[in-house]
From Swiss-Prot:
Residues 2-142 form the Globin domain. The lineage of its organism: Eukaryota, Metazoa, Chordata, Craniata, Vertebrata. The gene is HBA1. One of its GO terms (cellular component) is hemoglobin complex. This is Hemoglobin subunit alpha. Heterotetramer of two alpha chains and two beta chains. One of its GO terms (biological process) is hydrogen peroxide catabolic process. The modification Phosphoserine is found at residues 4, 36, 50, 103, 125, 132, 139.
């Protein structure tokens, strides 16, 4: 999915508002995903998946850091996310549908925390951005 210049601006502005909360929002999105889509828990058998667990918080920060990297390299996401794509495709073997589920939960989390900034245009831009990230992460599955 191609991001327009307006989409890129919307994503960078919205992610800038996330700021220091990125790790917390990442963890909250993971918790939402585990509660809403319990089958996603199978990829984390070694995690304590209870609310507020240190492992979920740590992984939420990793998710947020990866998205921060993608925002910073929005014009070159395939190179910026190459190692992460390899990890998820070849080592972790995560079913690609899970990226869509996490993207949805992340959108819900952002909408809950940034209601004033989460306009229809920003929502659409973030959705396109997360779809692009998902596409990059699944590109090595082929």
């Amino acid at each position: 999915m191609v991001l327009s210049p307006a989409d890129k601006t919307n994503v960078k502005t919205a992610w800038g508002k996330v700021g220091a909360h990125a790790g917390d929002y990442g963890a909250e999105a993971l918790e939402r995903m585990f509660l809403s889509f319990p089958t996603t828990k199978t990829y984390f058998p070694h995690f304590d998946l209870s609310h507020g667990s240190a492992q979920v918080k740590d992984h939420g920060k990793k998710v947020a850091d990866a998205l921060t990297n993608a925002v910073a390299h929005v014009d070159d996401m395939p190179n910026a996310l190459s190692a992460l794509s390899d990890l998820h495709a070849h080592k972790l073997r995560v079913d690609p549908v899970n990226f869509k589920l996490l993207s949805h939960c992340l959108l819900v989390t952002l909408a809950a925390h940034l209601p004033a900034e989460f306009t229809p245009a920003v929502h659409a831009s973030l959705d396109k951005f997360l779809a692009s990230v998902s596409t990059v992460l699944t590109s090595k599955y082929r």
